[in-house]
């Protein structure tokens, strides 16, 4: 994206974590126009040095970051940190783009996937919520279909990378594969296993992750009438999240039209050639920004219903890239 305005002072809060590191990587790759970079983390990390574009930057505290007055702060430091600190940044006139779940369902906050609803943003939005990783990739594919055929009901099962849990989960997987004892991020082994629980269980028997997908989808797409049920599963994979998605529409569709929609939608790469065994896989989505869609076919058990397979790198489009794209939009529209 090209910018016709002055460069910006940017803070990355949670710079020492997996998503924070990925945010720095994405900012560099996309040549985000930064005049001053402020790296922020917990008190125990203050003073630590991190490299960005061959320059070393020292991690500073939250209070120091606010005093430096960046125009935008990209937050990826967990929900509690966001609840405590995002309002303080906002009160100082800093626009916060928050990757945690803290503000997503707050009625006064926008929940943004740029390809879908960035047009809703205004200068008064000082805390902007970045959606859940598994929700983002799904709604990017659902949105054009909803516009044309009107989504009635979605059944989604996810196969989610350990990177969604964080550094300790990746270390657990690698240690188990190497036969090394180490700290457990999960209650159970993850190598050679799948765990049908992501986040804690709620009173209705669903996990918080599953309910995030239900509630966030409705908010992002601006339609509370969409019915959705989800089962979210952690698998021993690094590269990204995969989803089996079954979509029932109000209106009839033609498969060739669905293929054309996926081909023409910004942010989607269609990989669907079953004769040559071409379909999305996390090992191919790894370190890419696109949402990959394939295995498109009719549900032969029910009318007006479609099956598809959706894969994306959860640390990029599912987290860091989506946040940076929001920041790019704010700059391009002169909203900061």
Protein language model regions, located:
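N-terminal Rossmann-like NAD(P) cofactor-binding subdomain of oxidoreductases
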Residues: 2-190, 225-227, 291-292, 296-302, ...
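Charged docking surfaces used in two-component/phosphorelay signaling
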Residues: 73, 162-336
């Amino acid at each position: 994206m090209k910018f016709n305005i002055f460069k910006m002072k940017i803070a990355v809060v949670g710079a020492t974590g997996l998503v924070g590191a990925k945010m720095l990587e994405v900012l560099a790759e996309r040549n985000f126009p930064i005049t001053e970079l402020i790296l922020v983390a917990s008190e125990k990390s203050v003073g630590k040095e991190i490299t960005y574009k061959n320059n070393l930057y020292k991690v500073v505290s939250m209070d120091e970051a606010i005093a430096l007055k960046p125009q935008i702060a990209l937050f990826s430091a967990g929900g509690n940190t966001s609840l405590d600190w995002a309002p303080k940044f906002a009160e100082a006139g800093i626009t916060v783009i928050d990757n945690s779940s803290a503000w997503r369902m707050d009625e006064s906050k926008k929940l943004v996937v740029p390809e879908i609803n960035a047009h809703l943003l205004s200068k008064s939005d000082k805390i902007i919520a970045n959606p859940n990783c598994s929700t983002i990739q799904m709604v990017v594919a659902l949105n054009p279909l909803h516009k044309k055929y009107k989504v009635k009901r979605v059944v989604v099962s996810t196969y989610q990378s350990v990177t969604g849990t964080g550094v300790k989960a990746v270390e657990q997987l690698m240690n188990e594969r190497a036969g090394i004892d180490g700290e457990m991020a999960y209650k159970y082994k993850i190598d050679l296993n799948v765990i049908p629980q992501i986040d804690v269980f709620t009173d209705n028997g669903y996990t918080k992750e599953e309910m995030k997908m239900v509630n966030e989808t409705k908010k992002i797409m601006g339609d509370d009438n969409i019915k959705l049920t989800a089962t979210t599963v952690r698998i021993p994979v690094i590269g990204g999240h995969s989803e089996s998605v079954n979509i029932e529409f109000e209106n009839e569709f033609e498969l060739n039209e669905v293929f054309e929609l996926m081909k023409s939608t910004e942010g989607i790469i269609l990989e669907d050639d079953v004769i040559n065994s071409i379909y999305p896989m996390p090992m191919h989505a790894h370190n890419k920004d696109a949402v990959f869609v394939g295995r498109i076919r009719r549900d032969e058990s029910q009318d007006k219903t479609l099956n598809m397979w959706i894969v994306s790198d959860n640390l990029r489009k599912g987290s860091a890239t989506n946040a940076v794209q929001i920041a790019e939009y704010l700059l391009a529209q002169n909203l900061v």
